[in-house]
């Protein structure tokens, strides 16, 4: 086997190891209520989140600044000085001038047991959950891919006659060093009455 073959084998082995390691990271729970051709309807329960507000609405700048602030909180910049396990996905709510970057806290924590942030720009909030439409896309996220996913989801919802609020949230599930098997989503709140 030549050197390129060896490098490719190592590369694929590392990517598979990263993917399997990520499967052990706690993910925000949800229940799938309905599956359509391009999207699904989910119900998310109430969640505890750590959130920071960033100036701007461009993915790269908001993700970097916001991620670093909230990551500081879970990596020990908190009243207990202890690490909080990372969860997935990282959530970004884009606004026209300001955007919010949020990490969902592990289910083992409640508002009373979660350490307080020592960085005033990181706030602990309760996210109410609710019914959301979700669409998935792969690769590395950027403004164009996120906008395209939002437009595709809104078009599918309109065609399907499902009422929605124009409040999209980007969900990123992977670390930047994961090149293959990337999972990105956009969710949008919808009016949905389950047939249960």
Model region roles, listed by residue range:
Residues 1-196:
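A solvent-exposed interaction/effector surface
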